[in-house]
Protein backbone atom coordinates (compact mmCIF):
# COMPACT_ATOMS: atom_id res chain seq x y z
CA UNK A 1 0.00 0.00 0.00
CA UNK A 2 1.35 3.41 -1.00
CA UNK A 3 2.12 5.69 1.92
CA UNK A 4 0.41 9.03 2.24
CA UNK A 5 2.41 12.11 1.36
CA UNK A 6 3.85 14.19 4.18
CA UNK A 7 3.20 17.84 4.86
CA UNK A 8 6.23 20.13 4.78
CA UNK A 9 6.36 20.18 8.59
CA UNK A 10 6.02 16.39 8.86
CA UNK A 11 8.80 15.98 6.29
CA UNK A 12 11.03 18.34 8.29
CA UNK A 13 10.46 16.36 11.50
CA UNK A 14 10.92 13.03 9.74
CA UNK A 15 14.26 14.17 8.28
CA UNK A 16 15.38 15.47 11.69
CA UNK A 17 14.55 12.15 13.35
CA UNK A 18 16.45 10.21 10.67
CA UNK A 19 19.47 12.52 10.83
CA UNK A 20 19.51 12.41 14.64
CA UNK A 21 19.56 8.61 14.59
CA UNK A 22 22.34 8.59 11.98
CA UNK A 23 24.51 11.08 13.88
CA UNK A 24 23.93 9.98 17.50
CA UNK A 25 22.75 6.39 17.20
CA UNK A 26 19.46 7.10 18.98
CA UNK A 27 16.16 8.84 18.23
CA UNK A 28 15.53 12.36 19.56
CA UNK A 29 13.22 13.07 22.48
CA UNK A 30 10.06 15.14 22.05
CA UNK A 31 11.84 18.01 23.79
CA UNK A 32 14.73 17.84 21.32
CA UNK A 33 12.33 17.80 18.37
CA UNK A 34 10.41 20.78 19.75
CA UNK A 35 13.65 22.71 20.27
CA UNK A 36 14.93 21.94 16.75
CA UNK A 37 11.68 22.74 14.94
CA UNK A 38 10.74 25.72 17.12
CA UNK A 39 7.64 24.38 18.86
CA UNK A 40 6.72 25.95 22.19
CA UNK A 41 5.70 22.60 23.65
CA UNK A 42 6.81 18.97 23.25
CA UNK A 43 3.11 18.16 22.85
CA UNK A 44 3.23 19.67 19.36
CA UNK A 45 6.10 17.33 18.48
CA UNK A 46 4.07 14.42 19.85
CA UNK A 47 1.12 15.23 17.59
CA UNK A 48 3.34 15.36 14.49
CA UNK A 49 4.97 12.06 15.45
CA UNK A 50 1.52 10.49 15.74
CA UNK A 51 0.74 11.74 12.24
CA UNK A 52 3.97 10.19 10.93
CA UNK A 53 3.03 6.93 12.62
CA UNK A 54 -0.47 6.98 11.09
CA UNK A 55 1.06 7.48 7.65
CA UNK A 56 3.42 4.55 8.13
CA UNK A 57 6.76 6.37 8.29
CA UNK A 58 7.62 5.64 11.92
CA UNK A 59 6.59 3.37 14.78
CA UNK A 60 6.14 4.89 18.23
CA UNK A 61 7.31 2.61 21.04
CA UNK A 62 5.71 3.10 24.45
CA UNK A 63 7.60 3.36 27.72
CA UNK A 64 10.56 5.46 26.58
CA UNK A 65 11.11 9.10 25.67
CA UNK A 66 13.16 8.03 22.64
CA UNK A 67 10.69 5.40 21.44
CA UNK A 68 10.74 6.14 17.72
CA UNK A 69 11.59 3.61 15.02
CA UNK A 70 11.97 4.52 11.33
CA UNK A 71 9.93 2.25 9.06
CA UNK A 72 10.92 3.49 5.57
CA UNK A 73 14.73 3.28 5.62
CA UNK A 74 14.73 -0.13 3.95
CA UNK A 75 12.45 1.21 1.26
CA UNK A 76 14.92 3.99 0.49
CA UNK A 77 17.90 1.67 0.70
CA UNK A 78 16.30 -0.71 -1.78
CA UNK A 79 15.92 2.08 -4.33
CA UNK A 80 19.04 1.51 -6.39
CA UNK A 81 18.85 4.90 -8.03
CA UNK A 82 17.07 7.26 -5.67
CA UNK A 83 16.70 10.88 -6.78
CA UNK A 84 19.22 12.26 -9.28
CA UNK A 85 21.23 15.35 -8.37
CA UNK A 86 21.29 17.69 -11.35
CA UNK A 87 24.54 19.57 -11.89
CA UNK A 88 25.42 22.24 -14.46
CA UNK A 89 22.84 22.35 -17.25
CA UNK A 90 24.10 22.77 -20.81
CA UNK A 91 22.37 25.24 -23.12
CA UNK A 92 19.50 23.86 -25.16
CA UNK A 93 19.30 20.49 -23.38
CA UNK A 94 16.66 19.02 -21.04
CA UNK A 95 17.41 19.64 -17.37
CA UNK A 96 17.17 15.91 -16.62
CA UNK A 97 19.47 14.82 -19.46
CA UNK A 98 21.79 12.02 -18.35
CA UNK A 99 24.90 14.15 -18.82
CA UNK A 100 23.61 16.59 -16.18
CA UNK A 101 23.26 13.98 -13.42
CA UNK A 102 26.16 14.17 -10.97
CA UNK A 103 25.05 11.35 -8.68
CA UNK A 104 22.01 9.77 -7.04
CA UNK A 105 20.91 10.15 -3.43
CA UNK A 106 18.98 7.41 -1.57
CA UNK A 107 15.91 9.60 -1.21
CA UNK A 108 12.40 8.37 -1.96
CA UNK A 109 10.70 11.00 -4.09
CA UNK A 110 7.27 9.86 -2.88
CA UNK A 111 8.08 11.26 0.57
CA UNK A 112 7.37 14.73 -0.83
CA UNK A 113 4.03 16.14 -1.90
CA UNK A 114 3.77 16.29 -4.84
CA UNK A 115 6.45 13.67 -5.44
CA UNK A 116 9.98 14.92 -6.18
CA UNK A 117 11.57 14.00 -9.52
CA UNK A 118 15.10 15.28 -8.93
CA UNK A 119 17.37 17.31 -6.66
CA UNK A 120 19.15 20.59 -7.33
CA UNK A 121 22.06 21.90 -5.27
CA UNK A 122 21.35 25.43 -4.09
CA UNK A 123 23.99 28.01 -4.96
CA UNK A 124 23.83 31.29 -3.04
CA UNK A 125 21.51 32.78 -0.45
CA UNK A 126 18.82 34.36 -2.60
CA UNK A 127 16.09 32.29 -0.88
CA UNK A 128 17.44 32.29 2.67
CA UNK A 129 14.39 33.97 4.25
CA UNK A 130 12.34 30.83 3.64
CA UNK A 131 15.07 28.44 4.76
CA UNK A 132 16.58 27.51 1.38
CA UNK A 133 20.29 27.93 2.09
CA UNK A 134 23.52 27.78 0.12
CA UNK A 135 24.57 24.16 -0.39
CA UNK A 136 21.16 22.65 0.42
CA UNK A 137 19.57 20.07 -1.86
CA UNK A 138 16.26 21.28 -3.25
CA UNK A 139 13.68 18.59 -4.06
CA UNK A 140 11.88 19.48 -7.29
CA UNK A 141 8.61 18.25 -8.78
CA UNK A 142 8.74 18.48 -12.57
CA UNK A 143 5.76 20.45 -13.89
CA UNK A 144 4.90 23.27 -16.27
CA UNK A 145 1.69 24.07 -14.40
CA UNK A 146 2.52 26.71 -11.77
CA UNK A 147 0.72 29.44 -9.84
CA UNK A 148 1.72 32.87 -8.63
CA UNK A 149 3.49 32.65 -5.29
CA UNK A 150 5.01 29.22 -5.82
CA UNK A 151 8.77 28.69 -5.53
CA UNK A 152 9.83 27.53 -8.97
CA UNK A 153 12.89 26.28 -10.79
CA UNK A 154 13.14 28.43 -13.91
CA UNK A 155 15.55 28.47 -16.82
CA UNK A 156 16.19 32.00 -18.05
CA UNK A 157 18.40 32.20 -21.14
CA UNK A 158 19.86 28.81 -20.10
CA UNK A 159 20.67 29.91 -16.54
CA UNK A 160 18.79 27.87 -13.93
CA UNK A 161 17.45 29.80 -10.94
CA UNK A 162 15.18 29.18 -7.94
CA UNK A 163 12.78 32.03 -7.17
CA UNK A 164 9.19 32.85 -6.17
CA UNK A 165 7.00 33.29 -9.24
CA UNK A 166 4.78 36.24 -10.07
CA UNK A 167 3.10 36.72 -13.44
CA UNK A 168 1.93 40.30 -13.95
CA UNK A 169 0.63 41.37 -17.33
CA UNK A 170 3.11 40.41 -20.03
CA UNK A 171 6.01 40.13 -17.60
CA UNK A 172 7.26 37.39 -15.30
CA UNK A 173 8.86 38.37 -12.00
CA UNK A 174 11.17 35.93 -10.24
CA UNK A 175 11.40 37.18 -6.67
CA UNK A 176 14.25 36.31 -4.29
CA UNK A 177 13.66 35.79 -0.57
CA UNK A 178 16.53 38.06 0.38
CA UNK A 179 16.05 41.79 1.06
CA UNK A 180 19.44 42.61 -0.45
CA UNK A 181 18.53 41.28 -3.90
CA UNK A 182 16.24 42.56 -6.64
CA UNK A 183 13.76 40.42 -8.59
CA UNK A 184 14.57 39.10 -12.03
CA UNK A 185 12.14 40.61 -14.54
CA UNK A 186 11.61 38.61 -17.72
CA UNK A 187 9.71 39.62 -20.84
CA UNK A 188 9.01 36.30 -22.62
CA UNK A 189 8.76 38.19 -25.91
CA UNK A 190 12.41 39.17 -25.63
CA UNK A 191 14.05 36.52 -23.43
CA UNK A 192 13.77 32.75 -23.21
CA UNK A 193 12.18 31.43 -20.02
CA UNK A 194 10.99 27.95 -19.16
CA UNK A 195 9.54 26.71 -15.89
CA UNK A 196 11.17 23.38 -15.03
CA UNK A 197 9.29 22.58 -11.83
CA UNK A 198 8.31 23.60 -8.30
CA UNK A 199 10.20 23.25 -5.04
CA UNK A 200 8.62 20.60 -2.80
CA UNK A 201 11.22 20.21 -0.04
CA UNK A 202 14.73 20.94 1.20
CA UNK A 203 17.43 18.58 2.44
CA UNK A 204 20.02 20.32 4.58
CA UNK A 205 23.57 20.29 3.22
CA UNK A 206 24.92 18.53 6.34
CA UNK A 207 22.43 15.65 6.10
CA UNK A 208 24.85 13.60 3.98
CA UNK A 209 28.11 14.51 5.71
Swiss-Prot record:
List this protein's GO terms for biological process: DNA repair; DNA replication; negative regulation of DNA-templated transcription; proteolysis; SOS response
Query: Which InterPro entries does the annotation name?
Result: LexA, LexA-like, LexA/Signal_pep-like_sf, LexA_DNA-bd_dom, LexA_repressor, Peptidase_S24_LexA, Peptidase_S24_S26A/B/C, WH-like_DNA-bd_sf
Q: Which UniProt keywords apply?
A: Autocatalytic cleavage, DNA damage, DNA repair, DNA replication, DNA-binding, Hydrolase, Repressor, SOS response, Transcription, Transcription regulation
Pfam families registered for this protein in UniProt = LexA_DNA_bind, Peptidase_S24
Enzyme active site: 126 (for autocatalytic cleavage activity), 163 (for autocatalytic cleavage activity)
Name the DNA-binding stretches: 30-50
**Subunit details:** Homodimer.
Query: What's its job?
Result: Represses a number of genes involved in the response to DNA damage (SOS response), including recA and lexA. In the presence of single-stranded DNA, RecA interacts with LexA causing an autocatalytic cleavage which disrupts the DNA-binding part of LexA, leading to derepression of the SOS regulon and eventually DNA repair.
Q: What is this protein called?
A: LexA repressor
Per the UniProt entry, what species is this protein from, by scientific name? Glaesserella parasuis serovar 5 (strain SH0165)
Gene name of the encoded protein: lexA
